[in-house]
Amino acid sequence: KIYLTNSLEEYHPDTGTLFANWLSAEANEANHIKRDTPVMVVVGNPPYAVSSTNKGAWIQNLIADYKKDLNEKKLNLDDDYIKFIRYGQHYIDKNGCGILAYISNNSFIDGITHRQMRRRLLESFDKIYVVDLHGNAKIQEICSDGSVDQNVFDIMQGVSINIFIKTLLKKKTELGQVFHHSLQGKREFKYDQLNTSGIESINWEKLKCTDPGYFFVQKDFKEIEKYETFFRLHDLFLISGPGCKTERDGLNIKFTKEELRTVLLDFINLSEEEIRSKYNLHKDSRDWKVKWAKNDVIANFSNTIIQSYLYRPFDVRYIYYSGISKGFVGTPGYKRFYNMLNDNIGIIFPRICKGNNGFQHGFISRNIIDVAAGDAFSGAGTFFAPLYRYPDKSESLIVEQNIERQHNLNVELINQVAGRIGLTFNIDDLSYGLEDITSKLTFTPIDILDYIYAILYSPTYREKYKEFLKIDFPRVPYPKDQRTFWQLVQLGGDLRQIHLMESPILNMLITKYPVVGSNEVDKVRFETYDYEATLLNENGEFDYPDYLGAVYINDTQYFADVPTSAWEFYIGGYQPAQKWLKDRKGRKLGMQDILQSQYTPFA
């Protein structure tokens, strides 16, 4: 018999007066099941809802077990599917043995904030079987051979089939065993595999689930001892944190100061109703309301409050920045970004990285940055650390030059670096390191930044430590000697200047813009020139060089001689050369825009 009830609510001792007679009888029967009936099997496809409305005390108390000792600001553990896993675990634990079997959101099998959840499941169950069905369109998931990977449902979130088995055989002090199977490809292929397979016939991979992650996917941690001797990038900086989150990007971020100023004047002069109508702002959110935004602009607007803003790699736009939380900008990150209102520079790095391409992260900025400036997929956002700190002398945010500043580095870590390479850290040198570095006996804050930047872009580093770079802030090796340190400082400094569009080498343009026209971006496309493959060796293998092509912005105008590698290059999940142009569809490129489009492939 089937009863209508809310599974995530505890049984009610008295329901007879709450409902009509027929519903009261059904509720009482359901309460009897919840309270007295042993549950040996829980099966289902629980709902996925990050903003869960199921916030009853009973399930919130149960789910708290998954949140203990995480030391995370954002937990992401209140999704309904997680509550249903905890609900099922509760009833199987209560019975002493049984089976919990769900097809669900698969984020819990390798999520960083889910590590205590996985540990609790390992403590409860003897064996856990996970068929990872992948299909996560949010991170553009593909198969290992580059072919398409489809979801088994018409959703974007990846899914997995999870079977948790509890017997009375496992000791309480032991952790359960995890068996994993990965299934990728087209939807029909996955259906066929699932329809013709049983738990006994699947080729399971037994995982070694260990502290601190307890991952339910295969991880290659053979380099862990060496990697853990490196310093954690997040620990190097005294001040760091996520990028700025506007809550209304289309409204708050503009390509020109004039466009932004028009919006701000509307917020001053128009009523709330007129603002909502003109800018299609029908629904407020928790951190952004038209009333709050209007009050902020009226109280603080001035020309100096319009700031340059790194929205995406190489894409600098403009933002209104008063530093007021829940104002025109929802989450401005004032403690970090007031330091960027004067002359400064900062490094961008991820907390975790998802997607198919592994760690392709790291960027640099002289401006306030967006929460997604350095990562397209993670959901954890982009972290930013300014190199220098300024005294917070004014809440007016009026930019002043020559204000005294100091570095933003952990001196204890810096002293360890200095001791290893026999150099002295010059705490008073706050320059940007443009002088000759080959004969220096001291190093400066910018040298440390450049050293780190070179490491983050090292192909060897990215490949060797790719599993670790997926799950936490990057760790950076201590330099082994002066010679290596200065070599990497030089490489990192050159790359920094190129990425900031400050290097004179950018004037050596590698592309052309040969056709005069409207300069309006319409349909952006890349057409490779007609090449023949070059025979590489006697085995008949072919070498496909870095072909050049033309990037068309409309039917007639194009950028010529763009390398394929530059067009397809990734930074943080973005392809900057493509995204910069595609984001300007419908706009006319000015001279500076045309130069930017030619600089970006080189950078």
Regions found by a protein language model. Give the residues of each.
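Flexible phosphate/Mg2+-sensing switch loops adjacent to catalytic phosphate-binding sites
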Residues: 1, 63-64
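S-adenosyl-L-methionine
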Residues: 1-31
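Conserved proline-anchored active-site loop of SAM-dependent methyltransferases
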Residues: 7, 34-56, 91, 100-105
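Soluble or luminal CAZymes and related metallo-dependent hydrolases
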Residues: 22, 80, 84, 113
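Asp/Glu-centered strand-loop micro-motifs enriched in Gly/Pro and often flanked by an aromatic residue
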Residues: 27-32, 73-75, 439-440
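Amphipathic alpha-helical transducer elements in NTP-driven molecular machines
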Residues: 36, 40, 78, 82-85, ...
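Sequence-level detector for compositionally biased, low-complexity segments
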Residues: 53-62, 71-72, 90-603
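Glycine-rich S-adenosyl-L-methionine
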Residues: 66-91
